[in-house]
A protein has these predicted regions:
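Pepsin/retropepsin-fold aspartyl endopeptidases
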Residues: 20-424
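Bacterial Sec-dependent N-terminal signal peptides
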Residues: 1-27
């Protein structure tokens, strides 16, 4: 089940002339192949000019969760080389800067930068991008006077979780004196709560509405509410931002299933490291995250991305603990079309999340073997969607779900050191 994300477009395209070579840095950036781009830039080393290094590093540091370093590169690039950049390049760099500001909870600066971008690049930004920036600015405007989110882990924490009727991880969340069971979902950009749950937890949504793109491609009207304090086991979170959805957007009557709330990326990321122990039903958050030997994890806006190997190829996948099963996207179908059509059987795939359910054309492969870090999970009956439903489906080859996570005793996600690993 893919989750929604609001319409804050992350435009990675470059206005530098795109070479035909698929391994050219500009082509890799355009196709959001950031894991490959990292290796290419490291190999080129001194062959790159300072302007080129700053340019590519701004995107790479944004992707690998080094927002402050990314913004330092952007500021220096605009200070020293703005005359060498096109208006399109500058506008896209400013969008990266806004994303870094949002991840640092600097909402006022994000709003100011958004307004500057809209005022200064009217003739450069496509109308679709302007609408997305304007839509997201509604959120940042409402949060201008809100203090940054704070999350405190005073000791190694173990939080028991339950799986609901569709297999999603639900954790206990306390808001004031009210106890809740919310879905724990790395694929949710901003934490989400239904209108009835917001009222039950004495939350007051802000007045302005903004648009959220649902997994079906439809639009949900949402508002923002700020939770002054919430607790997840012994973890205290202050000033957590929630999107407030109409109950109908998180209810599926035909399945007799509904979601009251979702703990999403901003809260999960600030935990530093999480360990989901499927065998014991425990969410573990260590006080001190542990370094890893590789970095196979990145962020596209607030969407986790993981590096996956298939055959000899390195492919970026969305990494979504709120997805019950793995699905392969349109880029996978395009790249391996002959194999998919030869081995697979066509069918209509129900697909949905916050906002409803739709069906899309797909093929079902009997089995596929993927490479993730040092593991090679086998996935039977895997669907391959033939056309993009959401914008991100144009770039990411699949959406990893819980069918992979359940094959291992423990899954580790480190936002501090940017890796994902699985332990038997």
């Amino acid at each position: 089940m893919k989750k929604c994300m609001w319409l804050l477009a992350f435009c990675c395209s470059s206005a530098i002339a795109i070479a035909q070579d698929n391994d050219h840095p500009d082509s890799l950036l355009l196709r959001r192949q950031l894991f490959v781009l990292r290796n290419v830039i490291a190999a080129k080393g001194e062959q790159l000019s300072e302007r080129e290094r700053l340019y590519y590093q701004a995107y790479l540091d944004n992707f690998f969760n080094k927002g402050q370093t990314s913004n330092t590169s952007i500021d220096l690039l605009l200070q020293k080389y703005r005359a060498d950049l096109t208006a399109k390049q500058v506008s896209e760099l400013l969008q990266v800067k806004i994303d870094n500001l949002v991840k640092a909870y600097r909402y006022k600066a994000a709003y100011t930068s958004s307004m500057y971008l809209l005022d200064s690049f009217k003739t450069t930004l496509p109308e679709k991008d302007q609408a997305a920036i304007r839509n997201a600015a509604v959120i940042w405007e409402g949060l201008q006077e809100i203090a940054p989110q704070e999350l405190t882990v005073v000791q190694d924490t173990h939080v028991p979780f339950k799986r609901d009727a569709v297999g999603l991880v639900n954790i206990p969340v306390s808001i004031g004196d009210t106890s809740n069971e919310f879905v724990f979902d790395t694929g949710a950009g901003i934490s989400t709560i239904t209108e009835s749950s917001a009222a039950r937890n004495h939350l007051t949504p802000m007045n302005k509405y903004f648009d959220v793109e649902a997994a079906t491609g439809g639009i949900v009207k949402a508002r923002i509410a700020v939770v002054k304090e919430l607790k997840i086991g012994g973890i205290l979170v202050k000033n957590a931002v929630f999107m407030v959805f109409p109950d109908s957007a998180l209810t599926w009557p035909e399945a007799k299933y509904g979601i009251k709330g979702i703990i999403g990326f901003p809260v999960i990321e600030q935990m530093g490291e999480i360990r989901i122990n499927s065998k014991e039903g425990l969410l573990e958050v260590p006080q001190q995250p542990l370094p890893g030997s590789y970095a196979n994890f990145g962020l596209s806006n607030l969407r986790p991305v993981i590096n996956v190997a298939y055959k000899k190829d390195s492919l970026p996948f969305i990494f979504d603990t709120g997805a019950t099963a793995t699905a392969l996207n349109a880029p996978f179908f395009k790249k391996y079309r002959k194999e998919v059509m030869r081995r697979g059987k066509p069918f209509r795939l129900p697909q949905g999340g916050a906002g409803g359910v739709n069906t899309v054309n797909a093929y079902r492969l009997p089995e596929i073997v993927l490479g993730i870090a040092d593991k090679k999970p086998r996935l039977p009956h895997i669907p391959v969607i033939t056309a993009p439903v959401m914008e991100e489906d144009r770039y990411y080859y699949g959406n990893l779900g819980q069918d992979i996570m359940k094959q291992y005793r423990e899954m580790v996600i480190s936002f501090r050191y940017m890796y994902v690993s699985f332990n038997d």
